[in-house]
């Protein structure tokens, strides 16, 4: 199995820009024969104190990643943020199969808090 790691520069609160960057990484990884590509934590939403703002992109991100996985026939792992009730954010990591199906969606249960963000 050949695995690609995409250590990208994440643009905070700019999911569309991050998706465009990811698309080129995915295409390159597939062209070089990778079976899977993995992106960093919060790779498309970035860390944001405005989780409701980036949460609007959850479905477009998933649709784009599923399409790219199937189109390029490559498994993809990526991180994103959602907004749960009460306005608190959740840190997800999703893994898609080569056909674009969701294999796993992990929600971090012990998030790191450097600046006391959990109190917000």
List each language-model region with its residue ranges.
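Metal-dependent catalytic neighborhoods of phosphoester/phosphodiester hydrolases
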Residues: 42-59, 85-89
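Extreme N-terminal starter segment of soluble prokaryotic enzymes
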Residues: 1-5
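Short amphipathic alpha-helical segment that frequently serves as the phosphate-/nucleotide-binding helix
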Residues: 15-23, 62, 68
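A short, hydrophobic beta-strand-centered structural micro-motif
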Residues: 58-84
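Active-site beta-strand/loop signature of hydrolases that rely on acidic residues for catalysis
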Residues: 18, 26-52, 69, 76-77
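Short polar catalytic/cofactor-binding loops
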Residues: 7-12
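Active-site catalytic loop in hydrolytic enzyme cores
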Residues: 67, 84-120
